[in-house]
Amino acid sequence: MPSEWLLLATLVFAAYGAGQVWLVQLSSYPLWRFVGADEFRAYHAAWWRSIWGVVLAPAGLTAMASVLMIWLRPPRIASFEIWVGVGLQAALLVGTAVWWGPLMARLGAQTGGLDPKRYRTLLGTHWLRVAIVTAYALLIGRMTAEALGL
């Protein structure tokens, strides 16, 4: 029974993450170009502080739940599916630590506004992050349906 609860909790976290990453990609990031050069540094710093609870904490819980499923594998779920999920979470964490996090930290231009080249790079490469988060949510959704016999 604990494995089914873990799977359901992971489904909630994964669905939340998928909704959040699409909102960021389609709404939040595109709006950054409208922030004035004089205000961008303060805006970006406030944005960074604001995402810890609503973005980073749920993402961390999703990653931890993914790893916990190695030991608490739900019935009817093949171990390779668990490992695919762990791989997707690892790719997301490594990509964030190595690429997207540092890129976001350097979005401010020397002049104080948004660096247009880095901003375009973020908008273009962030689609990979959207794909990873979405793929994980779909995988967990399929696993939940399988575990519940749907």
Describe the residue ranges of each PLM region.
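Mid-bilayer segments of alpha-helical transmembrane spans in multi-pass integral membrane proteins
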Residues: 90-98
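Transmembrane helix-loop-helix
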Residues: 68-90, 146
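Interfacial loop at the N-terminal end of multi-pass membrane proteins
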Residues: 3-61, 108-120
